[in-house]
Amino acid sequence: MSSQYSNVENLSPQTIRQVMKELQDMESTPPEGIKVLINESDVTDIQALIDGPAGTPYAVGIFRVKLTLSKDFPQTPPKAYFLTKIFHPNVASNGEICVNTLKKDWKPDLGIKHILLTIKCLLIVPNPESALNEEAGKMLLERYDDYSQRARMMTEIHAQPAKCGAGASDAKDDDGPSTKKHAGVDKKLQDKKKEKLLKEKKRMLKRL
């Protein structure tokens, strides 16, 4: 695995303040189906949980994504990765995401929220014409039912709520990013899920 490093010392104080403000705004008023995970010690390491959109093969899943800001941000776009393993035409084997917003359509005034919403939209409308996963792109165009079944199966295996942290490491490849800094957040989320399930079980037992 390649070494991971931070560009936080290379960003201007103004950019750091701007990014942190946007992250805090999203934390207090999250976009629908998106939960941002703030790493206050390194604003260049941005992670979020995205709910699989209804009506798609990803609907039952929660997907962890990572944005890595370059030292020239916002003049140059960040790199985006799925940390949760996913079968999608526009996601490479190491999780890297291919979307025009982060390539030719990038503008410095586009914020983190816009990027995360674009990634969520990519789950609804994949673009097989610019596929990083050629198998998924070809399958989507020629055998959609098979594509949908494969994507749904991968979602059920890797993108379940209890795996939103543990499953992240499954998507790491040689060039994939690390998730260690957010391990504490993962544990809190999983503990809440377990507590909720326990309460539901107790309620069901009382009804018997």
Curated annotation (Swiss-Prot):
GO MF entries: ATP binding; ubiquitin conjugating enzyme activity
PROSITE patterns: UBC_1, UBC_2
Keywords for this protein: ATP-binding, Cell cycle, Cell division, Nucleotide-binding, Transferase, Ubl conjugation pathway
Gene Ontology BP, a term: protein ubiquitination
The protein's Enzyme Commission number: 2.3.2.23
Annotated catalytic residues: 98
Residue spans of biased composition, Basic and acidic residues class: 170-196
Domain UBC core stretches: 14-160
Family: Belongs to the ubiquitin-conjugating enzyme family.
Function per UniProt: Catalyzes the covalent attachment of ubiquitin to other proteins. Acts as an essential factor of the anaphase promoting complex/cyclosome (APC/C), a cell cycle-regulated ubiquitin ligase that controls progression through mitosis. Acts by specifically elongating polyubiquitin chains initiated by the E2 enzyme vih/UbcH10 on APC/C substrates, enhancing the degradation of APC/C substrates by the proteasome and promoting mitotic exit.
Name by which UniProt lists this protein: Ubiquitin-conjugating enzyme E2 S
Organism: Drosophila grimshawi
